[in-house]
C-alpha cells in the first residue's frame, strides 16, 4: 500500500486560495472579482482551514477548486484577456501620437455579452422572478443617485429608464399588493406570475455619497442586474402582448416625467399585417339596415331551406343526451384579469394631486389600483405651454383631492379632501377606509407595516382585544379579592379577641393563618395547575441537553410575550386617554 502524499486529497484538493485562483486564470484581481460576481461564485469556508491551506494558519480566502476549473472555459474570461491586450495597444498608440491607429483600435474595442450567463444562472423564468428583489433595489438606488466622477450620467439614466419600464408594467397590469412608507423609502410588493416581488424606492432627496464605498463592485452588480431586468421585462411585456421597449413621450419626459411619459401599446394596435375584424370592414351604409329588410331576408332563407328538403323523406329526430352528473363541481371558474380586490380599488375615482404631495409615489399607487389622476403640476405645465387646452379642461369628474396641508383655503363642492396616507392604508387593507380620520388637519392613525413582525406584536390583531378582556377580568377578580379581604379585615379590627382565638385554633390544627390569606389572594385555577404539572412531568423525562434547549426557547418566548403585553397595555392606556379627551371635547 502506497503512502498518500500530503496535500493531495481532502480539503487541500477541494479548496483553492484566491491567489492561486488568480494565477490559474491569469487575470487581475479586479477582473477575477467581476467574473465571480457574474457567475455567482462566492468564497467558501472549509471545515479545517489548516488542512485546506496545507498546514498554514494565515487568514486566506478560499474557493471551491471545481468552481475555478469551471471558470477556465468561460467566454467572458477570454474577452477580459482581449481587453487587456487592447488597453496595452491603445496606450502605446496614444504614447506615440498615432491618433488614427488609436481611433481604429477604439472602434474595434472588444465587447462581451452576459446573455449566456443569465441563461445559465436562471434556467426558468420563475427563477429569475424569485431573484428580482436585489436587482430592483440596486437599480432604484442608482436611478435616484446624482452623476459623479465615479458614476456617469449615462448609467443613472439607463437605470432610471429600466425602473420606469418596470413600474409602468406593474401599473398597467395592476399587480401592486402592499405599500409601506418608511424612513428609508417606500417599500412596494407586487405579485408577478404568482411570485411575490418586493423592492425599495428611495426618496428623491439630495444624497451625500460616502467616500468609503467601493463603486467598482457595485457597478459590476449593476451591469449584471440591468441585463437580468432587460430579460425579465422583455418576457413580461411579450406575455402581456405589449411592445418592448415602450414608446416614450419626449415632451412629457422633459416636463413632468414619470410614468405618464411611457406609452404602453399592444402589438395588435401597431402591427399592420393583422387583418381587421369583420365589424370594422363593414361599410357604414351596410350597418344601417331596416327591420323590414332583415325580416324579409330571414323569410327568404327559410323558403330556400324548405325547397332543399326532398319530398317523402321522413324527418328523423336526433337523440338528446343529458349529463348524468348534474353537479357543477368539475367546472372551474376562471379568474378574471383583475381578480384581486386591490386592482379595482380606485377604478371609480378621479384624484386631484396637489403640488405639495409626492407625485411619483401616488401616481404609481393610484394607477396600479385602476384609478385616474390629475396633478396640479401637470396643469401648471399645460397652462404655460398649451393655454387653449388648459381652458377646455373639465374638472367636474374629480372625486377626491389629495392635500398635505393643515387647512384648505377654498374647497370645491363634490370633492372629498383626504391626506396621502388614505391611499396607502386603503391599498394595504384591500378596501376603502373611512375618510373622516384622514381629513386635512386630522391626526392620522399610525401607518403600520403591512408585513408586520413575524410572531411579534400586531396592534390590529384580535389577540389584543382578547388581552383587553382578560385584563379586565383579572382586574375584576382583584377587586373582588380586595373587597373580600376588606370585609374580613373590618370585623377583625373590631374584635381582636376573636382574631386571636382563630389563630390559636389554626395553629392547633397545624395550618398557618397567613397561608390561608395568601391562598385566597392567589386563587389558582385547577386547569392551570394541571397544565403546569404536565409540563413538569415532561421536563423530568428530558435529557440535560433537551432541557437546556427547552429553557432557552421558553426564555425567548417569554421575553417576546412580555414585550407584547407591555405594548398592548401601552396602547390601551393611549386609547383610554384619547377617549377621555374626546368626551371632554
UniProtKB/Swiss-Prot annotation:
Subcellular locations according to the entry: Nucleus, Nucleolus; Nucleus, Nucleoplasm
UniProt main location, coarse: nucleus
Annotated Pfam families: BRCT_2, Pescadillo_N
InterPro entries registered for this protein in UniProt: BRCT_dom (IPR001357), BRCT_dom_sf (IPR036420), PES (IPR010613)
Assembly and oligomerization: Component of the NOP7 complex, composed of ERB1, NOP7 and YTM1. The complex is held together by ERB1, which interacts with NOP7 via its N-terminal domain and with YTM1 via a high-affinity interaction between the seven-bladed beta-propeller domains of the 2 proteins. The NOP7 complex associates with the 66S pre-ribosome.
Family: Belongs to the pescadillo family.
Protein name, entry field: Pescadillo homolog
Species annotation: Meyerozyma guilliermondii (strain ATCC 6260 / CBS 566 / DSM 6381 / JCM 1539 / NBRC 10279 / NRRL Y-324)
